[in-house]
UniProtKB/Swiss-Prot annotation:
S-adenosyl-L-methionine binds at R36, G55, D76, L120. The keyword NAD does not apply. GO terms for molecular function: 2-polyprenyl-6-hydroxyphenol methylase activity; 3-demethylubiquinol 3-O-methyltransferase activity; polyprenyldihydroxybenzoate methyltransferase activity. It comes from Pseudomonas paraeruginosa (strain DSM 24068 / PA7). This is Ubiquinone biosynthesis O-methyltransferase. InterPro entries: SAM-dependent_MTases_sf, UbiG_MeTrfase. The gene is ubiG. It catalyses: a 3-demethylubiquinol + S-adenosyl-L-methionine = a ubiquinol + S-adenosyl-L-homocysteine + H(+); a 3-(all-trans-polyprenyl)benzene-1,2-diol + S-adenosyl-L-methionine = a 2-methoxy-6-(all-trans-polyprenyl)phenol + S-adenosyl-L-homocysteine + H(+). Keywords: Methyltransferase, S-adenosyl-L-methionine, Transferase, Ubiquinone biosynthesis. The keyword Repeat does not apply.
């Protein structure tokens, strides 16, 4: 059985045409992208590396990593987001290889082929996130790094990521997130270790509604990113 939630795919298919509109529902992704790319680049040194972006959507992160000198492959199961990613690539001239395939299928085809694997803002949208993490471990080279991000599961995360972001501030469309699918850092850490990945670092992403700015912080109560590494 494929590790795909078709309702989640349909949700992003409907919004895909606005993926690169910086004032659309995807504004938060555009706003946090420089912070995420810098954090990854500082730890992985993207230039000259082979990178797989799992759950690439319309290619915001994929293109940014390619601009840093990485050879990037982006995979997603959404047909419309991938079409948008390919169209934007023609406009930007940034080379990314986009494929419609799951991480698990990709791991069967290309095990141990990538220096770096990223899987950001995707794990909370699949039925079995631990399966995706196991696939990421299989895809990365020995000694390679896997970067993951998701949303913590606690009352504060519900207040900020669902009530605040979707209903009060209207940063995201209502129904973007299902609180039950949010993932605690302890759970993400356990799944990573079970897959054979060592957790190296964790950082939070916080939003100030007054300044409308995001920043990296030690507060992992809501959005957070994790750096992991496969044994050499």
């Amino acid at each position: 059985m494929s590790n795909v939630d078709h309702a989640e795919i349909a949700k992003f298919e409907a919004l895909a045409h606005r993926w690169w509109d910086r004032e659309s529902e995807f504004k938060p992704l555009h706003d946090i992208n420089p912070l995420r790319v810098n954090w990854i680049d500082e730890r992985a040194g993207l230039a000259g590396k082979t990178v797989l972006d799992v759950g690439c959507g319309g290619g915001i992160l994929s293109e940014a990593m390619a601009q840093r000198g990485a050879s990037v492959t982006g995979i997603d199961m959404g047909e419309a987001p991938l079409a948008v990613a390919r169209l934007h690539q023609l406009e930007s001239g940034v080379a990314v290889d986009y494929r419609q395939i799951t991480a698990e299928q990709m791991a069967e085809e290309m095990p141990g082929q990538f220096d770096v694997v990223t899987c950001l803002e995707m794990l909370e949208h699949v039925p079995d996130p631990a399966s995706v993490i196991r696939a990421c471990h299989r895809l990365v080279k020995p000694g390679g790094q896997v970067f993951l991000s998701t949303i913590n599961r606690n009352p504060k995360a519900y207040l900020f990521a669902v009530i605040g972001a979707e209903y009060i501030l209207q940063l995201l469309p209502r129904g973007t997130h299902d609180f039950r699918k949010f993932i605690r850092p302890s759970e993400l850490g356990a799944w990573s270790r079970d897959a054979g990945l060592e957790v190296k670092d964790i950082i939070g992403l916080t939003y100030n509604p007054l300044t409308k700015h995001y920043k990296l912080a030690n507060d992992v109560d809501v959005n957070y990113m994790v750096q992991t590494q496969r044994e050499a």
